[in-house]
């Protein structure tokens, strides 16, 4: 079915179709003007045989009266092994100058969330091999994790380590959605992934990640839908290949922001703080598809930008309702050189309950947090009066807390290039055992430097003998 463009206002196009031949909502429409072709998505039916569509790329140079073809289906993107190691835009076209991919298997980006009978209801912990995460704020398999942190505290390195570890330990793959962030960051991430071996440029099918970018320079339609493009690729790995998949969304706030721009352009009445009235629905449609089924799981890690550090802003507040865990990166720890700079007291998880993780894990995590909290309270006294003014008991506690703080650091596989020390994957049992030994005072005679940037506790003991 073909119609013609009757109005263009920025990224919004009004298209008129012959009577009785209107396209369905969310269908893709291709508008062609000479060499230029723009794909749009139907958002509203206006009456008078007109639809209002939002463009996925720039509408510069388009004119009224040009032809518009209804494709009869939503935007569809390639899925499967061909996507690994490649960079896609919202329409599933490659943007890495390495040629096109074969569109043997394609899937529409709009789908229903899995039905209740398909879901895996028993909560299970997703082991990452990163001590601080597994012990203090464990991730749920098929859950959603919020990643909070400013610039330069190690967010990218943490993301790459997770991609690396899921491939090694779980045989899973990852999909990365760059939503409305800087193009330079997208390029840096791609180059770092090639350098660290997460993307194998010689043999792309051996890569561990597929990338979907809709960056800041894209129109709001593309930024609003690129998250769904990545999610569709992830769903294929989960449902068809029956794998555990990690889905990274950077940044979930930009998804909401793009939705807000589109909503205003479509003439909807804004709600609180100028956001779209459909905020909760749009967020829910994305988040409900991220889940654990009987076949496999999609575990999602979402970077959350908090506008003006106001946690009550509708965008972050709506996001929090969906999160199972939060990983907060701290500038103070990064300044001390403790990487990963995950704040052990600010990071939380709904999984940290004795009936889910077991009594030993729960007790050890609680004692670690108590020790670090007490150390934090004593820091003012230490700064003013010095360590010598503390009681014997408090001095012992401070010594153990400093060891714990250092033992929470860990050498990463993807950072071997910078640190020169080989990366370590630490199992949950080893993590619990190590922290329990420090808390029980079994290692009080070891120097605190021995615990810095090591894997398990045996390595710390070996390092102490060399010091």
Curated annotation (Swiss-Prot):
GO terms for molecular function: ATP binding; ATP hydrolysis activity; mRNA binding; proton-transporting ATP synthase activity, rotational mechanism. InterPro entries: AAA+_ATPase, ATP-synt_VA_C, ATP_synth_F1_bsu, ATPase_a/bsu_AS, ATPase_alpha/beta_chains, ATPase_F1/V1/A1_a/bsu_N, ATPase_F1/V1/A1_a/bsu_N_sf, ATPase_F1/V1/A1_a/bsu_nucl-bd. It is found in: Plastid, Chloroplast thylakoid membrane. It holds the Pfam family ATP-synt_ab. The gene is atpB. This is ATP synthase subunit beta, chloroplastic. ATP binds at residues 149-156. One of its GO terms (cellular component) is mitochondrion. Keywords: ATP synthesis, ATP-binding, CF(1), Chloroplast, Hydrogen ion transport, Ion transport, Membrane, Nucleotide-binding, Plastid, Thylakoid, Translocase, Transport. Belongs to the ATPase alpha/beta chains family. It catalyses: ATP + H2O + 4 H(+)(in) = ADP + phosphate + 5 H(+)(out). Produces ATP from ADP in the presence of a proton gradient across the membrane. The catalytic sites are hosted primarily by the beta subunits. F-type ATPases have 2 components, CF(1) - the catalytic core - and CF(0) - the membrane proton channel. CF(1) has five subunits: alpha(3), beta(3), gamma(1), delta(1), epsilon(1). CF(0) has four main subunits: a(1), b(1), b'(1) and c(9-12). GO terms for biological process: defense response to fungus; proton motive force-driven mitochondrial ATP synthesis; response to cold. Its main location: plastid. It comes from the Eukaryota. Its EC number is 7.1.2.2. It is an enzyme of class 7 (translocase). The keyword Ion transport applies. The keyword Transmembrane does not apply.
């Amino acid at each position: 079915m073909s119609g013609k463009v009757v109005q263009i206002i920025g990224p919004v196009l009004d298209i008129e179709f012959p009577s009785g031949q209107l396209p369905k909502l969310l269908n893709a429409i291709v508008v062609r003007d000479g060499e230029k072709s723009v794909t749009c998505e139907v958002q509203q039916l206006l009456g008078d045989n007109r639809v209002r569509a939002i463009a996925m790329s720039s509408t510069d140079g388009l004119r009224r009266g040009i032809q518009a073809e209804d494709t009869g289906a939503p935007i569809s993107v390639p899925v499967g092994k061909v996507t690994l190691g490649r960079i896609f835009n919202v329409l599933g076209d490659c943007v890495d100058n390495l040629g096109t991919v074969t569109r043997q298997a394609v899937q529409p980006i709009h789908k229903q969330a899995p039905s209740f009978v398909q879901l895996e209801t028993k909560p299970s912990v997703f082991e990452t091999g990163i001590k601080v995460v597994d012990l203090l704020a464990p991730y749920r398999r098929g859950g959603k994790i919020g990643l909070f942190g400013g610039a330069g505290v190690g967010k990218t390195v943490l993301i790459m380590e997770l991609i690396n570890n899921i491939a090694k330990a779980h045989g899973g793959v990852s999909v990365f959605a760059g939503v409305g962030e800087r193009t330079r960051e997208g390029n840096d991430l791609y180059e770092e992934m090639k350098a660290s071996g997460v993307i194998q440029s010689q043999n792309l099918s051996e890569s561990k990640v597929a990338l979907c970018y809709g960056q800041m320079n894209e129109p709001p339609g593309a930024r609003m839908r690129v998250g769904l493009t990545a999610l569709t690729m992830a769903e294929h790995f989960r449902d068809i290949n029956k794998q555990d998949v990690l889905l990274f969304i950077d940044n979930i706030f930009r998804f909401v922001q793009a939705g807000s721009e589109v909503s205003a352009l479509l003439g909807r009445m804004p709600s609180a703080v100028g956001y779209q009235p459909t905020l909760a629905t749009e967020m829910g449609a994305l988040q409900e598809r991220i889940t654990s089924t009987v076949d496999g799981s999609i575990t999602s890690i979402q970077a959350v930008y908090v506008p003006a550090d106001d946690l009550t802003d509708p965008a972050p507040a709506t996001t929090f309702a969906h999160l199972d865990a939060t990983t907060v990166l701290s500038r103070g720890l990064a300044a001390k050189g403790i990487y990963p700079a995950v704040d052990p007291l600010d990071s939380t998880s709904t999984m940290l309950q004795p009936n889910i993780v077991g009594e030993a894990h729960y007790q050890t995590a609680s004692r670690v947090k108590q020790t670090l909290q007490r150390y934090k309270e004593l820091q003012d006294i230490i700064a003013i009066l010095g360590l010598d003014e503390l009681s014997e008991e408090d001095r012992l506690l401070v010594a153990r807390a400093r060891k714990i703080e250092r033992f929470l650091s860990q050498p990463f596989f993807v950072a071997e290039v910078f640190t020169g020390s080989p990366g370590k994957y630490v199992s949950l049992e080893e993590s619990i055992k190590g922290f329990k030994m420090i808390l029980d005072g079994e290692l009080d005679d070891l120097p605190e430097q021995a615990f810095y940037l090591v894997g398990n506790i045996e390595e710390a003991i070996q390092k102490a003998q060399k010091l």
